[in-house]
UniProtKB/Swiss-Prot annotation:
Membrane-spanning ranges: none
Name under which the protein is recorded: Leucine aminopeptidase 2
Signal peptide residues on this chain, from the entry's feature table: 1-21
Native species: Trichophyton tonsurans (Scalp ringworm fungus)
Record carries keyword Hydrolase: yes
Main location: secreted
Residue positions with a glycan: 142, 235, 272, 352
Length: 495
């Protein structure tokens, strides 16, 4: 009897570890993953429990945020790591890195009237500089956009086309002593220059209304501006969390990710606790199944400061390793209170920016998810404003979902998705009000099920998916070479 029990124990152990040559994909006693079965494992109560957990990490510390390198984010990273490690289903690692954190505050007045301004992170400081205001043409992305008399002045620039960092650099090249960027959509504007640059000048953001008013004043007379920017800088150690299924073909990796950090201003529960918990919920549900292709989940750090964690990760892979990643799915803000179901425009049909080969197929898959349920959806552009940026620059097919940030919802969109016209998709975007109460439960549940739908599809098979061409070491697709490399979310305000 003892020998029989010993034999049985050895057999069970062998099965649980996977027998090389007999069951290459592991977990033979589990059913093969299907779209319906994985979606059925997604429960709203599990999603909201995770959302509440992230809120608790913010609440536990005086900063009341989960900004990278801070205590709230450290708690987030440890929890994600431990939760996944405990499943036994994943090989989990923390990828350590050091990045420069920046926090800036601005005060701005024009002709003695105070304006509500936000300093761009990584802005050089300004000690109450006073100068005449001039207005850049177009979007301030080219040297020819700046008036000949820009030297020694503060320049007003409209948001759009290029990054805030490039606008600040162009202003510096034109010998301006400061730059004020105003929004091109209703609402205030806070953003980042994406990093330090000697060409940058002190830079602040203004609302569309205030910016247009200033431009009108300049057109009719002289405007004197006083600008003060206080900037703090600190090198901080932080981590990505990477979890890859032990089972599945590790030469055909399906990868998905979401950033785990917040801005300084608040806990970041929609931005991007929603995406973080969405993929976490799917990762836990996936442990009930076996699969054919390995699935790699990533929680990126320091996205809000220039996509730093995802860029660090992609840069750490040579072309041979990156070629194993057959596609990348990005989920950034999937629980917006005034949501719209938006899918990255992989085929370029809406925004004339086509993703690498395979991106169109990803878009079509998500379209099918919504179409099969009779639900509306719309495309959203590949702007480079989220963690997919580093992947598409290296020709990795990408796609994903987004429910909206600072952009105002139109009456036409209300007819499709409900909600309130004239109000931002997320009125608490990048603010202290981005709490649990900011989450639209219907939106986050639907989009998490969509994540499960896509993961099950590609974990089972990549049949019909375009084959990735092999390229040289660290080759960058020239179509995306000038895409901004810093920011905070698809929504990220660095451009």
């Amino acid at each position: 009897m003892k020998s029989q029990l010993l034999s049985l124990a050895v057999a069970v152990s062998t099965i649980s570890q996977g027998v090389v040559g007999q069951e290459p994909f592991g977990w033979p006693f589990k059913p093969m993953v299907t779209q319906d079965d994985l979606q059925n494992k997604i429960k709203l109560k599990d999603i909201m429990a995770g959302i509440e957990k992230l809120q608790s990490f913010s609440d536990a510390h005086p900063e009341k945020n989960r900004v990278f390198g801070g205590n709230g984010h450290k708690d987030t990273v440890e929890w994600i790591y431990n939760e996944l490690k405990a499943t036994g289903y994943y090989n989990v690692k923390k990828q350590e890195q050091v990045h420069l954190w920046s926090h800036a505050e601005a005060a701005l007045s024009a002709n003695g009237k105070d304006l509500k301004a936000s300093a761009m992170s990584y802005s050089p400081p300004a000690n109450k500089i006073m100068a005449e205001l001039v207005v850049a043409k177009n979007n301030g992305c080219n040297a020819t956009d700046y008036p000949e008399n820009t030297q020694g002045k503060i320049v007003l620039i409209q948001r759009g086309v290029c990054s805030f960092g490039e606008k600040s650099s162009q202003a510096g090249d034109a010998k301006a002593i400061g730059a004020v960027v105003y929004n091109n959509v209703p609402g205030s504007l806070a953003g980042t220059l994406g990093g330090l640059d000697k060409r940058h000048v002190p830079t602040a953001g203004l609302s569309q209304e205030d910016g247009k008013n200033l431009a009108s004043l300049v057109a009719s007379g002289k405007v004197d501006v006083t600008m003060n920017v206080v900037s703090l800088f600190e090198n901080r150690t932080t981590w990505n969390v990477i979890a890859e299924t032990k089972g599945g073909d590790h030469n055909n990796v399906v990868m998905l990710g979401a950033h785990s950090d917040s801005v300084d201003a608040g806990p970041g529960i929609n931005d991007n606790g929603s995406g973080s918990i969405g993929i976490m919920t799917v990762a836990k549900a996936l442990t009930n199944f076996k699969l054919n292709n390995a699935v790699r989940f990533a929680w990126w750090t320091a996205e809000e400061f220039g996509l730093l964690g995802s860029t660090f990760y992609v840069d750490s892979l040579d072309d041979r390793e990156l070629h194993k990643v057959k596609l990348y799915l990005n989920f950034d803000m999937i629980g917006s209170p005034n949501f719209a179901n938006q899918i990255y425009d992989g085929d370029g049909s809406a925004y004339n920016m086509t993703g690498p080969a395979g991106s169109a197929e990803i878009e079509y898959l998500f379209e099918k998810f919504f179409d099969d349920q009779g639900l509306p959806h719309q495309p959203t552009a590949f702007t480079g404003r989220s963690d997919y940026s580093a992947f598409i620059k290296r020709n990795v097919p990408a796609g994903g979902l987004f429910t909206g940030a600072e952009v105002v919802k139109t009456p036409e969109q209300v007819k499709l998705f409900g909600g309130e016209a004239g109000v931002a998709y997320d009125k608490n975007y990048h603010g202290k009000g981005d709490t649990v109460a900011n989450i639209n439960k219907g939106a986050i549940f639907l989009n998490t099920r969509a994540i499960a739908y896509s993961v099950a599809e590609y974990a089972r098979s990549l049949k019909g998916f375009p084959t990735r061409p092999k390229t040289g070491k660290r080759a960058v697709n020239p179509q995306y070479a000038k895409m901004p490399g810093g920011g905070c979310g698809h929504h990220t305000v660095f451009m």
